[in-house]
UniProtKB/Swiss-Prot annotation:
Pathway assignment: Amino-acid biosynthesis; L-leucine biosynthesis; L-leucine from 3-methyl-2-oxobutanoate: step 3/4
Name of protein: 3-isopropylmalate dehydrogenase
PANTHER family in the cross-refs: D-MALATE DEHYDROGENASE [DECARBOXYLATING] (PTHR43275:SF1)
HAMAP family in the record: LeuB_type2
PROSITE patterns: IDH_IMDH
Species this chain originates from: Rhodococcus jostii (strain RHA1)
Catalytic class of the enzyme: oxidoreductase
Recorded family membership: Belongs to the isocitrate and isopropylmalate dehydrogenases family. LeuB type 2 subfamily.
Catalysed reaction, written as an equation: (2R,3S)-3-isopropylmalate + NAD(+) = 4-methyl-2-oxopentanoate + CO2 + NADH
Length: 336
C-alpha cells in the first residue's frame, strides 16, 4: 500500500504518527511518502500546493492528513489554497463522516441508545466554489453575492454513493436540504434521490429540512442511518454530529473520489490546536479512526473493524485518566 502522508501543522504531526503506528501493525508492506504542506512551508516559501507535489500525491493509493492551520497564517489562505484546491484537483466529491457514540465517550446524549449514522456530504459544489463577488465595497450600497452551484451530475453521484452505502447498513437514506426555500437546487437533489432510489427498492428514504434535522439530531439521532446532503448543509450538520457523538476530537472523515480515479484523503475532523501542540496530550483517536476509514475504503474491512473494536475498548477503559498521545497509540496498536 502506497500512502501519501501530510502531517500538517500543530497536533497534526503528533496524531498522524500514532495513526501510522496503528496502520503499520496491520499493513506490513505499508510504503509512506511524507509531504511538507501547511503553515510551516507556506511561511518559509510561500508555497501552498505545488504542482509537483500534487502530481506525486496522485500516484498513491490514499492520503492521510493530520491537520492544517496556524495563527501565523491569515485565516482562509491555507483552507482555500491547500485544502479546497486539493479537494477540487482530486475530485473529492464525497465527504464521508461516520458518527457513532462509543461507550465511555463524553456526550450530552450519552444516555441515547444506538447513535450510529453516516453523513454523506457533497464536497465540490454549492457555495464553496468561489462563484461570487462584491461591488461598492465600503460604501452604504455595498453588495456581495455567493452563488451556490448545484449540478445533476454532482448531486446524482453523491446520492448514488449514499444509497450504495445504505445497502451495507440499515438500508435507510435521509435527504437533508431546504427545498421549500431553495427550490431550484432542492429540485435537483429531490429528483436525484427519487431516481436512484428506484434502483434500491429495499432502501427506505426520508426527507428533513436542515433546521428540523438539527433538532432531530439532538432529540432523536437514532432515526438516522445514512444522511445525504449538499456542501453547505453538510458542513453544518457534520459538526453537530461530532458534538453529539463525543466531540470532534473523536470524529474521523474521508474526502473521497468515488470513481477511484484519484486517491482519497482521510483526516481527523479536529484542527491543528496550536495551543496544545508539542505537549503530547492531543487525543489521536480521530486520526486512528480515520486510518480505519482509509482501510475500509481500500477494501480491507476486516482490518478496519479491528481498529474500530480496539478504539471502542480503549475509550471504554479510559475513565477520567488524562490522555497521553503516544500511550493511546501504543494501547490501540498493542490490541491489534
Amino acid at each position: 500500500m502506497k500512502l501519501a502522508v501530510i502531517p500538517g501543522d500543530g497536533i497534526g504531526v503528533e496524531v498522524t504518527a500514532e495513526a501510522l503506528k496503528v496502520l503499520r501493525k496491520l499493513v506490513p508492506d505499508l510504503q509512506t511518502t511524507e509531504y511538507d504542506l501547511g503553515a510551516r512551508r507556506y511561511n518559509a516559501t510561500g508555497e501552498l500546493l505545488p504542482d509537483a507535489d500534487l502530481a506525486a500525491i496522485r500516484e498513491h493509493d490514499a492520503i492521510l492528513l493530520g491537520a492544517i492551520g496556524d495563527p501565523s497564517v491569515t485565516p482562509g489562505v491555507l483552507e482555500r489554497g491547500l485544502l479546497l484546491n486539493m479537494r477540487f484537483a482530486l475530485d473529492h466529491h464525497v465527504n464521508l463522516r461516520p458518527s457513532q457514540l462509543y461507550p465511555g465517550s463524553k456526550s450530552p446524549l450519552a444516555a441515547q441508545p444506538d447513535i450510529d449514522f453516516v453523513v454523506v456530504r457533497e464536497g465540490t459544489e454549492g457555495p464553496y466554489t468561489g462563484n461570487g463577488g462584491a461591488i461598492r465595497v465600503g460604501t452604504p450600497h455595498e453588495i456581495a453575492t455567493e452563488v451556490s452551484i448545484n449540478t445533476w451530475f454532482g448531486a446524482e453521484r453523491v446520492v448514488r454513493y449514499a444509497f450504495a452505502l445504505a445497502q451495507t447498513r440499515r438500508k435507510h437514506v435521509t435527504l437533508i436540504h431546504k427545498t421549500n426555500v431553495l427550490s431550484n437546487a432542492g429540485a435537483i437533489w429531490t429528483r436525484a434521490v427519487e431516481t436512484v432510489s428506484a434502483e434500491y427498492p429495499d432502501v427506505e428514504t426520508a426527507y428533513c429540512h436542515i433546521d428540523a434535522a438539527t433538532i432531530y439530531m439532538v432529540t432523536d439521532p437514532s432515526r438516522f442511518d445514512v444522511i445525504v446532503t449538499d456542501n453547505l448543509f453538510g458542513d453544518i450538520i457534520t459538526d453537530l454530529a461530532g458534538a453529539v457523538t463525543g466531540g470532534i476530537g473523536l470524529a474521523a472523515s474521508g474526502n473521497i473520489d468515488a470513481s477511484g480515479t484519484n486517491p482519497s484523503m482521510f483526516e481527523p475532523v479536529h484542527g491543528s490546536a496550536p495551543d496544545i501542540a508539542g505537549q503530547g496530550i492531543a487525543d489521536p483517536t480521530a486520526a486512528i479512526l480515520s486510518a480505519a476509514l482509509l482501510l475500509r475504503h481500500l477494501g480491507r474491512d476486516g482490518d478496519a473493524a479491528r481498529i474500530e473494536a480496539a478504539v471502542e475498548a480503549d475509550l471504554a477503559s479510559r475513565g477520567d485518566s488524562k490522555v497521553v498521545t503516544s500511550e493511546v497509540g501504543d494501547r490501540i496498536a498493542a490490541a491489534l
